[in-house]
From Swiss-Prot:
It is a single-pass membrane protein. It comes from the Eukaryota. The lineage of its organism: Eukaryota, Sar, Stramenopiles, Ochrophyta, Bacillariophyta. Keywords: Chloroplast, Membrane, Photosynthesis, Photosystem II, Plastid, Reaction center, Thylakoid, Transmembrane, Transmembrane helix. One of the components of the core complex of photosystem II (PSII). PSII is a light-driven water:plastoquinone oxidoreductase that uses light energy to abstract electrons from H(2)O, generating O(2) and a proton gradient subsequently used for ATP formation. It consists of a core antenna complex that captures photons, and an electron transfer chain that converts photonic excitation into a charge separation. This subunit is found at the monomer-monomer interface and is required for correct PSII assembly and/or dimerization. The keyword Lipid metabolism does not apply. NCBIfam families: PRK00753.1 (NF001972). This is Photosystem II reaction center protein L. The keyword Transmembrane helix applies. Its main location: plastid. It is found in: Plastid, Chloroplast thylakoid membrane.
């Protein structure tokens, strides 16, 4: 458990931050589109 655990945790954290970044971009895109169409 002391071997591949930190590496796996780092990859999982990186993937989570990537998903949060994509979600933030999606929300900003929706807000900008609502401003433009309004």
């Amino acid at each position: 458990m002391t071997g591949p655990n930190p590496n796996k945790q780092a990859v999982e954290l990186n993937r989570t931050s990537l998903y949060w970044g994509l979600l933030l971009i999606f929300v900003l895109a929706v807000l900008f589109s609502s401003y433009f169409f309004n």
